[in-house]
Each structure stands twice: as C-alpha cells, then as structure tokens.
C-alpha cells in the first residue's frame, strides 16, 4: 500500500490532484479540505494516500493530514459508505467536526452533507461512536510529527498478536510519557513490557 507520496503539484482542482513524483504523475481524488490546504501548482507537497482497488479501477485518494486519512478509513468501515461518499463527507466536514458530530450524536450536521440521509447519519453515528472516541483520544495524545513511529509500532504489535485497541492505548500512553522522544524499537519494547 502507498502510505504517502511527495512531489510537486502539476494539476489541482477541488476534487482532483496530480502530483509529479520522479517523472510519474499520480492522480488523486481529494476532499475540499485537502484542496484548501494545498499551495499553488509547482509547489512541493506531501499527501497521505489510500489506494482503493475495484474490479474496474485502482483509485488513489489523497489527504493533506493523517487525521483526515484516519477519518476516511473509519468512514469506510461503516456499512454502505464507500470512498466517494466518505470523501464527500470530508469535503463538507473537517475531521474534528466529524468526530464532534459523532460523539454528540448530531445527525443534523451529518444530514447536511449531500447524499447523507437520516438513516445513513444514524448508521455512521452508531457504528463509529465507540471508534471515534478512541481515534480522537489517540490524535490528542499522539505528538505531531510522530505519525510514522506510531503507525509502525502499531503494525509491529499487531503482527505480534497484541489486540489493536490495547496496542493503541499503550503506544499512545508511551508516546505521551516520552513526549515523542523515542525510537520505534524502544516504543515496541516498552509496549511489550507494559
């Protein structure tokens, strides 16, 4: 999977972005939030990505922040929400506004998004209410700039058989305690001891 791409912007529209990486142009579908955060054409950028594979196409979705990507992935876990609907939701709501709407059971805010009716809004809240609190806590505990270390440690702990929610709490607590000044190896060792 492609975690992110870094290169120069060659084309930018409110829903699409083309980034030149080593002479190859990657086309990404983006939200309005990502569009607003990007600089002009020819500027260098780092875009977090999600590759969606279907029988007919391979589509890259791009996000300016790891938080936006995490919200996108959470939305994809909801029954009936595909990548196009998820990107539409993230175009209308920031990750923080989405998390707030889910935690406060605010169906009105979700229904304001084009294509989201009352049942879909209720389903999003029902299926994500437990997960978003964890994601929100994780994001507030996770020091900025440490996303790669955090994700790498979670992946390693998962492969070692540690339950995802336990690993998330443990890794976030260790990162908070060490204020981000820790290597991946030390983080994994401490998590296994804890």
Swiss-Prot record:
It is found in: Cytoplasm. Gene3D superfamilies: 5' to 3' exonuclease, C-terminal subdomain, DNA helicase RuvA subunit, C-terminal domain, Nucleic acid-binding proteins. Pfam families: HHH_5, RuvA_C, RuvA_N. GO terms for biological process: DNA recombination; DNA repair. Residues 1-64 are annotated as: Domain I. One of its GO terms (cellular component) is cytoplasm. Residues 144-150 are annotated as: Flexible linker. One of its GO terms (molecular function) is four-way junction DNA binding. Keywords: Cytoplasm, DNA damage, DNA recombination, DNA repair, DNA-binding. Homotetramer. Forms an RuvA(8)-RuvB(12)-Holliday junction (HJ) complex. HJ DNA is sandwiched between 2 RuvA tetramers; dsDNA enters through RuvA and exits via RuvB. An RuvB hexamer assembles on each DNA strand where it exits the tetramer. Each RuvB hexamer is contacted by two RuvA subunits (via domain III) on 2 adjacent RuvB subunits; this complex drives branch migration. In the full resolvosome a probable DNA-RuvA(4)-RuvB(12)-RuvC(2) complex forms which resolves the HJ. Belongs to the RuvA family. Has three domains with a flexible linker between the domains II and III and assumes an 'L' shape. Domain III is highly mobile and contacts RuvB. This is Holliday junction branch migration complex subunit RuvA.
